[in-house]
Amino acid sequence: MMSMRGNNVHFSRATVFHEVIPGHHLQQFMTSRYKTYRRIFNTPFWTEGWALYWELLLWDKGFAKSPENRVGMLFWHMHRCARIIFSLSFHLEKMTPQQCIDLLVDRIGHERDNATAEVRRSFTTSYGPLYQAAYLLGGLQLRALHRDLVETGKMTDRAFHDRILKENAIPIEMIRALLADRKLTPDYAADWKFYSAPESKN
């Protein structure tokens, strides 16, 4: 019963575009055909970032039409954030597995069996400490790139998404450079900023 409640149609609908099209299924279809030599450089920032980017983009475009479907999408947004909190907290020895489960149940609204399975999946597989954070970091990078290039009219949605997938698994900063026609030099440095640099006290 918990599994049925936790995977109801409104929650499940919100994961379809992450896992299938335009998410991982489309991603894997394209990466098996274009520049396949790059697949060995795959990282969760690119793989999971792509799928989460679509969750964000479809929310922005009003994909969820009913209140129930909006709740389903927001549930997964909360879930992604909670994963970052409990994963990093566990690896920093700030939370136990049971506390991670309780967080998902009490703060996010997971069924307890589903929360237990989620925590087990996170800690008994090969996921690294930053795997869960990579979803959101990669997704936010792609979303920012979409705003820079598509929402300003420099590229169409179709050209933007096709180009990303056809480049296969490379760092998102490299995708950014290629799409913006920046020259890559040996000393090229990323200019992403996820924080504000402390002010100088000189």
Which residues does each predicted region cover?
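Long, His/Glu/Asp-enriched segments that create or flank divalent metal/ion-associated functional microenvironments
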Residues: M1-N202
